[in-house]
Amino acid sequence: MEDFVRQCFNPMIVELAEKAMKEYGEDLKIETNKFAAICTHLEVCFMYSDFHFINEQGESIIVELDDPNALLKHRFEIIEGRDRTMAWTVVNSICNTTGAEKPKFLPDLYDYKENRFIEIGVTRREVHIYYLEKANKIKSEKTHIHIFSFTGEEMATKADYTLDEESRARIKTRLFTIRQEMASRGLWDSFHQSERGEETIEERFEITGTMRRLADQSLPPNFSCLENFRAYVDGFEPNGYIEGKLSQMSKEVNAKIEPFLKTTPRPIRLPDGPPCSQRSKFLLMDALKLSIEDPSHEGEGIPLYDAIKCMRTFFGWKEPYVVKPHEKGINPNYLLSWKQVLAELQDIENEEKIPRTKNMKKTSQLKWALGENMAPEKVDFDDCRDVSDLKQYDSDEPELRSLSSWIQNEFNKACELTDSIWIELDEIGEDVAPIEHIASMRRNYFTAEVSHCRATEYIMKGVYINTALLNASCAAMDDFQLIPMISKCRTKEGRRKTNLYGFIIKGRSHLRNDTDVVNFVSMEFSLTDPRLEPHKWEKYCVLEIGDMLLRSAIGQVSRPMFLYVRTNGTSKIKMKWGMEMRRCLLQSLQQIESMIEAESSVKEKDMTKEFFKNKSETWPIGESPKGVEEGSIGKVCRTLLAKSVFNSLYASPQLEGFSAESRKLLLVVQALRDNLEPGTFDLGGLYEAIEECLINDPWVLLNASWFNSFLTHALR
């Protein structure tokens, strides 16, 4: 084969092929088929470019004889055949002068007429299989692919063959001649069978042995091996094909694929009705903390001790009274419950030794608030099989609620910085590999951006409350245990701080199944007057319990202190996820990492430092009615974290449904923005599925409103 190559190809091509093989550490004495393939590919690239010029008027012309007077520019820039460094220099230069998008892999040519890079393929197999492998490897709409085979077939992106028929015929004839010459020397069969598919990163992880046999056995009919199936799936063109398949399925199935244009989508319809109300398990932006700095009291770290110490820092207690009643509740019971907490805390202080936990007396007000004896008696199903009118409870449809401005304010507040540090920089030991060094550097930069964030405070508060409540639910099943709502942080100066937000009283908690509910009453301090946004506090009874002196620009001012009381409930599975809220930090860090990776792959070096250090650069954060909002990288980190935290705090079936269904519409819109000419069927059904999830949940309604802003600006 080596002798044939040296006889059959131009010496310049042979020399370039030798260099290329040397660069990749391949021995042409052994890899003779590869040597022949490289020479063939080089020759096709040169023939593609030969005789094609652009004249002074910018028109593409074919000139077969050199005319020394003609001021002509080569139509194609040849990249194939250069050493890697030089080839990338040429590519970068083309991108800088023409504004073309930089390809991830080295292409073969650049077409100055069509302003696009071209990837040339020469295959001994079927052209469509090889085309799909190329497309799967390149994954770029911008690079044009043109495949030739030794049998005279060809395939190109969007059937755009770039060259005139005569130029292409010349290439096909040359390939056919090479094939015949090889066949006459008995070399063709070996050459034909030696072609391997395009190597992509994923395919280098070879599946072998039993797993390989299982993969090959598990293929759909008509596929001989995993590679063919992979190539088919990766290059699958759905439009048209789906339509045909559906029509074969059933006479009733009728799906006409409609083109999805800029004018096609309409905004998502948000429900009308009274404004939505707060439904989180604890107060967010409205919470007030009673704090102690540098705690060193006896029993420090025991929640009840810490809570009593924090309560002692406030001196403005007064006779409590209801300022905003709960419409459906017995408000005097909420008032009596708070008075009972104060009285029982006072009793503890009068004891010689403070106990580690406090179980509340089972008073009538607490029994009512915690739903004691309210659950209907359970009857074994076998005992009532014969009851003729056995049926489920009639339950009312939930009332539709409209979006209210308070949830956007809550989100904005969650993105802000506080004056405390809520998470420590984890020390995980020395890095032993370069990748560990990059990973810990990214983690440290990210931690620095979010450690002061209010969303991080919500994480630590959520972790503490859920852990304490789950522990108490298991350890004191029959007791009405008093659980302080506590968090710990550091001041800017590094001093430790313990904060008390209020109290929870837990009801009976015989939790056998993950979804069994434990009721609790929450009592939380706040300076927010509930009468300003009464719709937000529909589920709460709010008491005024004291006056707090605050420092302001005009000196000390007195502000009323409120207590937000409500009955609530949670389950083992919800508490388990609440305890794991730190995962939100990981999720948002991974999103930032993918942004850094994208930037690093373009620049071909790790961009972590530049990413966080370049304070002048702004990044897109989200959509608002004003347009695309931008901010610093720190703001992006905090916004992504806040979104993740709110997904946890406001988790619900409505959110699950909206996220899954709206994502489908988002993907279609993204495809339209990428000029992929998407098609859809039953778009009305998709809108129905999305809008079915918009009932009364504030976080879902806000996300739907953001989605509408995105639609408006994405389709301009």
Swiss-Prot record:
Influenza RNA polymerase is composed of three subunits: PB1, PB2 and PA. Interacts (via C-terminus) with PB1 (via N-terminus). Plays an essential role in viral RNA transcription and replication by forming the heterotrimeric polymerase complex together with PB1 and PB2 subunits. The complex transcribes viral mRNAs by using a unique mechanism called cap-snatching. It consists in the hijacking and cleavage of host capped pre-mRNAs. These short capped RNAs are then used as primers for viral mRNAs. The PB2 subunit is responsible for the binding of the 5' cap of cellular pre-mRNAs which are subsequently cleaved after 10-13 nucleotides by the PA subunit that carries the endonuclease activity. A motif (Nuclear localization signal 1 (NLS1)) lies at residues 124-139. GO terms for biological process: cap snatching; DNA-templated transcription; symbiont-mediated suppression of host gene expression; symbiont-mediated suppression of host mRNA transcription via inhibition of RNA polymerase II activity; viral RNA genome replication; viral translational frameshifting. Its EC number is 3.1.-.-. The gene is PA. Mn(2+) 2 binds at residues 80, 108. It is found in: Host cytoplasm; Host nucleus. This is Polymerase acidic protein. Mn(2+) 1 binds at residues 41, 108, 119-120.
